Amino acid sequence: MYSPHFDGLDLDGDGVGDGGHVWGLDGPQGSADTLVLSFENRSASISPDCLGAGTAKTLHRVDSRFFVSGGRLMCRGSSNAATPQPVAESLEDFQVRYALRLGSGDLATLQWLDADQMAGQWPQVLAVQVCLQMVGVVGAVGGPRLEGPSFQGCNGLDQAHEGRRHIVLRNTFVLRGLGRVR
């Protein structure tokens, strides 16, 4: 439960926090997405932002904005909002999907949506699925010769490796301590 001091993200663009804890933006033509997470700061010592920096106790909301720039996953945190920092290198893609619960009780199911399908539903997000597609350097030494389509990218399509190793990392993060999400 949030305290009355937590105003959350401004989900409707009116300059006033709407209590939201997650927001996203789909990248144009399938390019990398943007993800913003927000939570209530209850203690300066245990509420770091995405850069690992503590926040002032007077700051009631901690925001972390993730986006891709120049092949790096960047983070703009509350501790230094003016200067985003890289948190991962060699990134080819960053895709995010959001889970909403449909129905209730034992018949409840999840619907996974992209950011552009989420209008008016941000406060109901239960989980976030993040996919990072990373790539090695061209002509790296070692390992077997790479031939043919070698991996399935974040977009779900088979992609040629183009002589480089790729890794696709996908994880689902449950929000608000709601238990398991499938």
Model-assigned labels for residue ranges:
Residues 1-124, 129-131, 137-166, 181-182:
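N-terminal pilin/flagellin-like segments and related low-complexity appendage regions
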Residues 173-182:
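Short, low-complexity, Pro/Ser/Thr/Gly-rich segments in the mature regions of secreted, periplasmic
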Residues 168-171:
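Short amphipathic
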